[in-house]
């Protein structure tokens, strides 16, 4: 008799044990409410904004009596509403887009776009650090080939495209579509993609206009660009992007996402994006919260928050630059100008994160598989609601930890 088969629970426990051994097992945690937030994506601090809350409640109160809070079904069945379509038009107008289509999350939006739009034989070229949701969508895609290029590298994109064009002349002839996918702002290092350079390269190598850009603006929404409209609008490149995805769960303190695109693409997604078709649509409270956030953006009511956030970013960056540390393996800062996201690289990120948390500052150690091995870091996110005193307190905590680490190394 052979060995009896493992039960499912044994297999699950073994998988978790392997992650535990690699120090990369994920767990849900709850930190004290008194902790200072330097971790969340609530960049504008709208989630605690009295102005945002008042606008949201006002929209709810304006609804007719007995207006249903739940959508009741998929957008294609009973879940659609005039309010949802008006909201899509309102957001699309703000972003200078022909039309938009709401999804329940940025994850659903990316899965819907990547899984349905590329056609058989098409090529997807994507930044190696693109969101996991894009990878999920690509796995479901009918595209003939998917190939990554080095992170935010114009030369890397050029090399990949040139190699593919050489291998398949139909690309140069405009007989096959090429989708170029990237994020405008990346979540781990906060760096901004060289979008203008990408456009120039695609124009040079694909002169028949068969290169289509798919850009995820999740971490740019509300923070970058005029009135928080995003990096693409800051560059004036709206017309060059085939699809833009803006999400509402970060700086806008709500939930969901919108795919900005032309009317034909919107209609195609309604017919083919399974992550839209086979899920219950957003209910009225979610739509109202999205509307409240965008009304504040449109009216310029968040520009002061953007300005304050920018001041805190500059202050924190200066403080980090002034830290007296000698060993880059212990501590190294990666930061892109004007980004609220800071990457504090360390060989012991869990130790640094724990020290900060003990002092009342919420930061997170980011470990593999979320980031590649050797790229571990403590991720710090600044918010408009943070104070200079809180930022200085975090800097002091980091400085004290660095001094202790250097003394320990000196004894060795």
UniProtKB/Swiss-Prot annotation:
GO MF annotation list? 8-amino-7-oxononanoate synthase activity; pyridoxal phosphate binding
Pfam families linked to this entry: Aminotran_1_2
What does UniProt give as GO cellular component?
A: peroxisome
Instruction: Indicate whether Transferase appears among the record's keywords.
Output: yes
Q: Recount the UniProt induction comment for this entry.
A: Expression is increased when transferring biotin auxotrophic mutant mycelia from biotin-supplemented medium to biotin-deficient medium.
> What positions does the entry give for pyridoxal 5'-phosphate binding?
106-107, 187, 219, 247
Top-level division of the source organism's lineage: Eukaryota
Q: What class of enzyme is it?
A: transferase
Q: Biological process GO annotation list?
A: biotin biosynthetic process
Pathway(s): Cofactor biosynthesis; biotin biosynthesis
Catalytic activity of the protein:
6-carboxyhexanoyl-[ACP] + L-alanine + H(+) = (8S)-8-amino-7-oxononanoate + holo-[ACP] + CO2
User: Which cofactors is this protein said to need?
Assistant: pyridoxal 5'-phosphate
Q: Which Gene3D superfamilies match?
A: Aspartate Aminotransferase, domain 1, Type I PLP-dependent aspartate aminotransferase-like (Major domain)
**N6-(pyridoxal phosphate)lysine-modified residues are where?**
250
What EC number(s) does this enzyme carry?
Answer: 2.3.1.47
Q: Does the keyword field hold Nucleus?
A: no
Quaternary context: Homodimer.
Mind telling me which PANTHER family this protein's record contains? 8-AMINO-7-OXONONANOATE SYNTHASE, CLASS II AMINOTRANSFERASE/8-AMINO-7-OXONONANOATE SYNTHASE
What family does the Swiss-Prot or TrEMBL record give for this protein? Belongs to the class-II pyridoxal-phosphate-dependent aminotransferase family. BioF subfamily.
Q: What is this protein called?
A: 8-amino-7-oxononanoate synthase
Higher taxonomy: Eukaryota, Fungi, Dikarya, Ascomycota, Pezizomycotina
The coding gene here is bioF
